């Protein structure tokens, strides 16, 4: 009886340890989202191939992240003076 209980507990420990953690499809989905977000942060776009005036930043799920060569950061506040009348 004790050996059957030991085997049962070992089986339970194995089942619970294998079932914990993210599955492969969840990890793949998270990786795709992270790569797409990194591409978006630098002002890029995930495409099948980049043009001659773009460079490859990182690889997205669908292909390279194409960023314009003359990338300039978007400023939150405009430095141009406002005209008031």
From Swiss-Prot:
Protein localization: Secreted
Chief place where the protein resides: secreted
Secretion signal span: 1-23
GO biological process, one term: defense response to bacterium
Highest taxon above the source species: Eukaryota
Keyword list, A-Z: Antibiotic, Antimicrobial, Defensin, Disulfide bond, Secreted, Signal
UniProt cross-references to InterPro entries, sorted A to Z: Beta_defensin_dom (IPR025933)
One GO cellular component term: extracellular region
Function according to Swiss-Prot or TrEMBL: Has antibacterial activity.
Sequence similarity: Belongs to the beta-defensin family.
Name the UniProt record assigns to this protein: Beta-defensin 18
Organism per entry: Rattus norvegicus (Rat)
């Amino acid at each position: 009886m004790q050996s059957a209980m030991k085997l049962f507990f070992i089986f339970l420990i194995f089942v619970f340890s294998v079932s914990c953690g993210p599955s492969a499809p969840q990890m793949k989905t998270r990786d795709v989202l992270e790569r797409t977000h990194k591409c978006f942060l630098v002002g890029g776009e995930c495409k099948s191939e980049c043009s001659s005036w773009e460079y490859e930043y990182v690889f997205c799920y669908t292909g390279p992240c194409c960023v314009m060569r003359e990338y300039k950061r978007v400023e939150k506040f405009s430095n141009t003076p406002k005209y008031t009348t």
